[in-house]
């Protein structure tokens, strides 16, 4: 959804010291708003020719580890809001990319309006907050949700972290679906630090060590 200037602004916020320019790894971002027309990978009748061409292009990247579509609705005109067939088709397309290229394929999607007010640490309750057809979750190997924490938790965490109150600083994250066994479905509290969400437990441990010295 972002154009090139906004992408660079966000990257500078995440990593202001420019160390990323010395990394041995590459990140490629395709800003859809900069193109002459939308990049539609799936329509109601199926995946598009552009979707197939994209996979061929991705094959030219050596040692590819991650492909991310953000957000889903920017790449499809299929009715993923209510059609389980459309949701399953998207899941199959992502699975095909992973199988052919040996990489992880992530899709970023929004929660429904209720997800903004759900105050529960139950991961199965959080699962119902994912917008659209249930197959969007069911067709994936795993699904994570993130939503703002409640006001009381946010106030407490900001105080503990010694920062001014910021309603957007505290997020509840849950693993709500996984095809693997022996996974942790408990909801985790994350704190936004320097533009990056970090597990609160790790920050608390760091603060404890700092206070001791």
Over which residues does each language-model region extend?
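Compositionally biased, intrinsically disordered low-complexity regions enriched in proline and serine
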Residues: 29, 94, 186, 209-211
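Phosphate-binding/switch region of NTP-binding enzymes
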Residues: 13, 66, 85-196
């Amino acid at each position: 959804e972002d154009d090139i200037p906004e992408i660079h602004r966000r990257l500078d916020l995440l990593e202001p010291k420019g160390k990323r320019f010395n990394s041995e790894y590459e990140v490629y971002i395709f800003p859809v708003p900069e193109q002459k027309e939308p990049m539609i990978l799936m329509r109601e009748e199926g995946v598009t020719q552009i979707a197939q061409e994209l996979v061929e292009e991705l094959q030219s990247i050596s040692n590819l580890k991650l492909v991310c579509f953000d957000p889903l609705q920017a790449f499809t005109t299929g009715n993923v809001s209510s059609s389980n067939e459309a949701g399953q088709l998207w899941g199959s397309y992502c699975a095909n990319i992973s199988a052919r290229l040996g990489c992880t394929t992530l899709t970023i999607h929004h929660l429904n309006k209720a997800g903004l007010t759900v105050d529960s640490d139950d991961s199965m309750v959080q699962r119902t907050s994912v917008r659209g057809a249930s197959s969007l979750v069911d067709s994936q190997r795993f699904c994570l949700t993130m939503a703002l924490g409640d006001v009381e938790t946010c106030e407490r965490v900001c105080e503990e972290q010694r920062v001014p109150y910021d309603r957007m600083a505290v997020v509840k994250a849950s693993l709500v679906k996984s095809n693997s066994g022996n996974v942790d479905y408990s909801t985790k509290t994350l704190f936004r630090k320097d533009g990056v969400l970090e597990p609160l437990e790790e920050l608390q441990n760091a603060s404890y060590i700092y206070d001791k010295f």
